[in-house]
From Swiss-Prot:
Domain of life assignment: Bacteria
Job description of the protein: Binds to 23S rRNA. Forms part of two intersubunit bridges in the 70S ribosome.
Quaternary structure and interacting proteins, as annotated: Part of the 50S ribosomal subunit. Forms a cluster with proteins L3 and L19. In the 70S ribosome, L14 and L19 interact and together make contacts with the 16S rRNA in bridges B5 and B8.
GO BP terms, alphabetized: translation
Keywords (A to Z) from UniProt: Ribonucleoprotein, Ribosomal protein, RNA-binding, rRNA-binding
Keyword presence, Ribonucleoprotein: yes
UniProt cross-references to Pfam families, sorted A to Z: Ribosomal_L14
Official protein name in the record: Large ribosomal subunit protein uL14
Gene Ontology molecular function terms on file: large ribosomal subunit rRNA binding; structural constituent of ribosome
Length: 122
C-alpha cells in the first residue's frame, strides 16, 4: 500500500535511485496504490549522468510492494521492498532495463513493455 509521501526504490536504469510519492492517480479521493497502479512522484536520489535528475516530477507504475496482495486464486504475493518503474507520457517505461521481479498484475493493467523487459514475473 503506497500513499502520499511513501518512498520507493526505482527498478529501472533511468538514473533515479529513489522517488517520493506526490499523488496516487485514479480518482480524487484515492488514498492507496498497489501493484500496477500509477503514481506521480518526485526524484529524491539520482546518479550523475542519468536520464532524470533530483527534483524531477515523474509518473511511475508500482511493480513491487511489501504489503501482501490477495490474488483471484486465493494466493498472496508480497515482496521485500517497495519499487516502481518510471514512465513516459505514453505509458511506456523510460528506461531500457528493469531490475528484479515484477508482479503479474502488470499484465492485467496492460503494461506489456515492462513485462517483456522484466527478468521475472511472479
Amino acid at each position: 500500500m503506497i500513499q502520499q509521501e511513501s518512498r520507493l526504490r526505482v527498478a529501472d536504469n533511468t538514473g533515479a535511485k529513489e522517488i517520493l510519492t506526490i499523488r496516487v492517480l485514479g480518482g480524487s479521493g484515492r488514498r492507496y496504490a498497489g501493484i500496477g497502479d500509477v503514481i506521480v512522484a518526485t526524484v529524491k536520489d539520482a546518479i550523475p549522468g542519468g536520464n532524470v535528475k533530483k527534483g524531477d516530477v515523474v509518473k511511475a507504475v508500482i511493480v513491487r510492494t511489501v504489503k501482501e496482495r490477495r490474488r483471484q486464486d486465493g494466493s498472496y504475493i508480497r515482496f521485500d521492498e517497495n519499487a516502481a518503474v518510471i514512465l513516459k507520457n505514453d505509458g511506456d517505461p523510460r528506461g531500457t532495463r528493469i531490475f528484479g521481479p515484477v508482479g503479474r498484475e502488470l499484465r492485467e493493467k496492460k503494461f506489456m513493455k515492462i513485462i517483456s523487459l522484466a527478468p521475472e514475473v511472479l
